[in-house]
């Protein structure tokens, strides 16, 4: 090999080394750029995932709030229905009792009639027993008589139809009950018709 050939070989070798170094630098730059791109891509992917997670959390919270509102509404509905049912049970007999009151009045009037005949007294005793039995059954279903005579006049329970002047009663006291008043639990079915002292 001649000196010239060796010089060409050395130049070629140097050139190859230089190209290898350049290639190595280029590869490093490409890897560095790729690595930076990967980091940026990973960072933006993480940001996207975090946004998606946050959005999903908000949706879950929103659905949970809707559920809690619906649950509260349902509980209120159940309570309202229970109260309405209880009220219906309490006052279910109101219409029937209101219709029976005139019959009770008629029985009371019949019992006030006096007679001397034994058959009349026997009949009256039977009517009295039926009357007491009927009142007992009605009282067991919540019917109560409104107390009137001697009580202070109360427009919630009494209906004044006459005035009286009686020194044995206080002013504004009921002196006489003309028609018995009744209430069902705490609801007045019919006020007592009364005479009130001045």
Swiss-Prot record:
One of its GO terms (cellular component) is cytoplasm. Pfam families: GrpE. Coiled coil: none annotated. Residues 1-58 are annotated as: Disordered. One of its GO terms (biological process) is protein folding. It is found in: Cytoplasm. It comes from the Bacteria. NCBIfam families: PRK14140.1. Belongs to the GrpE family. Homodimer. This is Protein GrpE. It comes from Staphylococcus carnosus (strain TM300).
